[in-house]
Amino acid sequence: VVDGPFAVINADDYYGVNAYKMIYDYLSSGEDNEKYRYAMVGYMLSNTLTENGYVSRGICDTDENQCLTGITERTHIEKTKDGAAFTEDDGKTWVPVALDTTVSMNLFGFTASMLKELESRFSAFLTENLEKNPMKCEYFLPAVVGDLIGEGKAEVKVLKSADRWYGVTY
């Protein structure tokens, strides 16, 4: 049973020592107030790219206080001679992305309130999605985070890491 702050990571990723310290320090420094108080470690896109093809990354938008306002998933980002670019039409057109763009690699820090939110939304998610495509029905954590931000219930501080991120599996 989780009754305090906790971090969520992808099991097959290496985030760097500094990322864990930042999440720990943030979660240790306060509690929920009028909004849920969450955090996400953000990385520079350049520190998450591979030489082996393309990657999927969540491009982060933040406000003046470095709080997350949205994540846009880009499923095909590649290194280019000028930096990086993404495509949404199988390479017919490419849109440049700055190498210092902040991306999410799914390292989040939450208070116990997140578990209540996930549980309260899960039944509606299944009702809405399971019938459409049961083999691909996936409850995406960043989607719930985005919903909570949009509803004004949560504030997600983006903690910027200079560490290099590594995917352990390929």
Locate predicted features.
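Active-site-proximal specificity loops/subdomain of glycosyltransferases
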Residues: 1
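Short aromatic/hydrophobic "clamp" motif used to bind/position activated sugar donors
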Residues: 6-7
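The conserved acidic donor/metal-binding loop of glycosyltransferases
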Residues: 11-14
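Conserved core of the sugar-phosphate nucleotidyltransferase
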Residues: 17-108, 112
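Catalytic beta-strand/loop signature of glycosyltransferases that borders the donor
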Residues: 101-102, 157-163
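Conserved active-site beta-strand element of glycosyltransferases/polysaccharide synthases
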Residues: 109, 156-159, 167
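A C-terminal functional module that forms or caps the active site or interfaces directly
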Residues: 119-154
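Glycine-rich, charge-dense phosphate/pyrophosphate-binding loop(s)
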Residues: 170
